[in-house]
Amino acid sequence: MSFYRGTASHPWHDLHPGNDAPNFVSCVIEIPRGSKVKYELDKDTGLCFVDRILYSSVVYPHNYGFVPKTLCEDGDPLDVLVLMQEPVVPMCFLRAKPIGVMQMLDQGERDDKLIAVHADDPEYKGFTDISQLPPHRLAEIKRFFEDYKKNEHKEVVVDDFLGAEEAKKVVKDSLNMYQEHYVPRKLRNVYE
């Protein structure tokens, strides 16, 4: 993290992705579980802004945010849905364990979602792979993402859920893409 006198820290660029990434990752939560408010990171300022209120009656089924110092094909940090018992406030950060990835297309563009469990939540920390979740939980997540933009006349297609090993590969790839895009060559870390 950078704490310069008079300079705010940027949650995407200044927070560490986790000492044990990709097995455990730091996550910044933008949207709490149960919210209809679509908060989003303003990439220029690092502040959280209200992007929109969801047009339908659905609410976010779990805490939703991103992994710091990651970059995906859509130009955003890696999205993460963190399963845990309680909602948390926007822009807090926590430690989570990736257990899967949901492959998704948002208006024809790849927009995969990392699925993780809070590392210290007694109800969820024992899960190591998405296949261990009850089928209803996966159906709930899939239905939310298929429906949450329908009333805006935007198409979202959920392709498939993949397990923990694929999730860790997605984390490594997004960490490396961030390094290639934002970090000078001689200062880069390579995640293998």
From Swiss-Prot:
Mg(2+) 1 binds at residues 74, 79, 111. The N-terminus is blocked. One of its GO terms (biological process) is phosphate-containing compound metabolic process. GO terms for molecular function: inorganic diphosphate phosphatase activity; magnesium ion binding. Substrate binds at residues 38, 52, 64, 148. It catalyses: diphosphate + H2O = 2 phosphate + H(+). InterPro entries: Pyrophosphatase (IPR008162), Pyrophosphatase_sf (IPR036649). It comes from the Eukaryota. Its cofactor is Mg(2+). It is found in: Mitochondrion. Keywords: Hydrolase, Magnesium, Metal-binding, Mitochondrion. It holds the Pfam family Pyrophosphatase. Its EC number is 3.6.1.1. The keyword Cell division does not apply. One of its GO terms (cellular component) is mitochondrion. Optimum pH is 7.5. Mg(2+) 2 binds at residue 79. Monomer. Belongs to the PPase family. This is Soluble inorganic pyrophosphatase 2.
